[in-house]
């Protein structure tokens, strides 16, 4: 499996001289733009050169057996390419082409059955068909996804190329890298179970994020997730749990979906974190990849304004987290430091001073982080609307990071940067702030609801681990 993600040579079967045509040539262009340092072999019997590279009529004409073949020819011609791969000993194959089982036709079913037969005959490790294939920034295998993409602590397994690409690009926009990802499409040969095992054994991956439409062999998948989940968190976005989505799955990857009740039971019994949206998938993956295990479910909230304090408390308690009272010792220390006017000491903490006075923030976080009732901290980095003529909090981002980093290593600490409201300038400031926090190892979320849901998943996963030790 290593060479699948770290190929030193790639043959692109079906590369074209037409650069505006999606398929082999678009992959070739991306490899060149991303600075892939391995050897690239475009295969096209009608061309002498493609994008400055010598073209070859077929795989047998190559000067070496490449580590990976990317197959981009029309579906009826794919079996012949696989036959050649087997004959020359090329065992790692990514089939980009669609037109197989997902069509729901006898012809598509027959073609996919032939792909499976040839894989069994020659021992081919096939990703696909009908997929974008493997992605690995460390090796330059970035024909899709974020470019340039830096490696990071996350592995992604998905049956959708578009969804996988969206997640890699969103994570990269926050300065968070991906170690490896795979879009596996119909998963005819290599499936979720195979990639789960590979990523479980990769020491660079801390969290595995999955988008699934079908789990393949359910018993094997259940066993593997339950075993791996006690070592690494697995975040699953399951498509097609309701009727309309399930109908779409059949034409997308030719899979059959399971019911919502089945997946809820699966999550309870395996410790897998089941999420319901792209945003929740990304938010939870970020929290699990950056934060330590919380000791409990008690959350300290630092916010500004009495109404915000009330609403935020409700949001976190709705997610099953606690907003506990602080100890008498903590309360005494807070009262000595909280301004009398416009502030309320306690949990939540209502103090605008924390937005603009780094020393005040440092004192407060040190006090509450020492309180045994507090397992996690949430700091609101409100971007002040254009009122009150108060200094811009974005100027304090680096100082805030300096204060929160040592706290976050002891107790999970996140920030919320709510910059909506339709103001483009404030929106851009919010994006910039969230990126800097995430780059520094502190998850940052655009809403309190998203922060609460991510911390609820973090807490539930580590509670499961404590209850199910290795």
Range-by-range predicted roles:
Residues 1-470:
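Catalytic-core regions of core metabolic enzymes
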């Amino acid at each position: 499996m290593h060479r699948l993600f770290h190929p030193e040579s790639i043959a692109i079967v079906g590369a074209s001289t037409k650069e505006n045509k999606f398929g082999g040539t678009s992959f070739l262009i991306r490899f060149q733009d991303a600075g892939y340092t391995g050897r690239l072999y475009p295969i096209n019997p009608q061309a002498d050169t493609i994008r400055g590279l010598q073209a070859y009529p077929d795989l047998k004409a190559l000067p070496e057996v490449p580590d990976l073949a990317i197959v981009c020819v029309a579906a009826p011609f794919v079996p012949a390419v696989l036959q050649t791969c087997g004959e020359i000993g090329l065992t790692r194959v990514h089939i980009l082409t669609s037109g197989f089982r997902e069509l729901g036709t006898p012809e598509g079913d027959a073609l996919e059955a032939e792909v499976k037969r040839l894989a069994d005959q020659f021992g081919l490790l096939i990703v696909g068909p009908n997929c974008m294939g493997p992605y690995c920034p460390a090796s330059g295998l970035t024909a899709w996804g974020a470019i340039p993409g830096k490696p990071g602590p996350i592995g992604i397994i998905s049956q959708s190329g578009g969804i996988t690409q969206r997640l890699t690009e969103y994570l990269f926009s926050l300065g968070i890298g991906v170690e490896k990802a795979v879009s596996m499409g119909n998963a005819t040969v290599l499936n979720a179970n195979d990639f789960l095992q590979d990523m479980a054994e990769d020491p660079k991956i801390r969290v595995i994020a999955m988008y699934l439409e079908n789990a393949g062999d359910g018993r094997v998948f259940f066993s593997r997730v339950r075993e791996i989940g006690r070592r690494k968190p697995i975040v699953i976005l399951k498509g097609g749990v309701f009727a309309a989505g399930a109908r779409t799955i059949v034409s997308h990857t030719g899979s059959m979906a399971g019911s919502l009740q089945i997946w809820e039971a699966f999550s309870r019994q395996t410790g897998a974190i089941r999420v319901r949206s792209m945003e929740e998938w990304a938010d939870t993956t970020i929290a699990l990849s950056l934060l330590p295990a919380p000791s409990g479910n008690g959350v300290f909230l630092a916010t500004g304004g009495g109404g915000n304090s009330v609403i935020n408390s409700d949001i976190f308690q709705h997610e099953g987290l606690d907003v506990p009272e602080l100890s008498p010792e903590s309360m005494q220390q807070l009262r000595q430091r909280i301004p009398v006017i416009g502030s309320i000491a306690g949990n939540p903490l209502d103090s605008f001073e924390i937005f603009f006075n780094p020393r005040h923030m440092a004192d407060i976080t040190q006090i509450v982080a020492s309180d045994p009732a507090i397992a996690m901290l949430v700091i609101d980095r409100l971007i002040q609307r254009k009122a009150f003529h108060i200094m811009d909090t974005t100027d304090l981002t680096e100082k805030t990071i300096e204060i929160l980093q040592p706290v976050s290593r002891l107790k999970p600490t996140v920030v919320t940067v709510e910059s909506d409201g339709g103001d483009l300038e404030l929106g851009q400031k919010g994006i910039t702030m969230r990126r800097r926090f995430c780059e520094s190892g502190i998850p940052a979320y655009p809403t309190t609801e998203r922060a609460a849901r991510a911390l609820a998943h973090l807490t539930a996963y580590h509670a499961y681990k404590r209850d199910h030790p290795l």
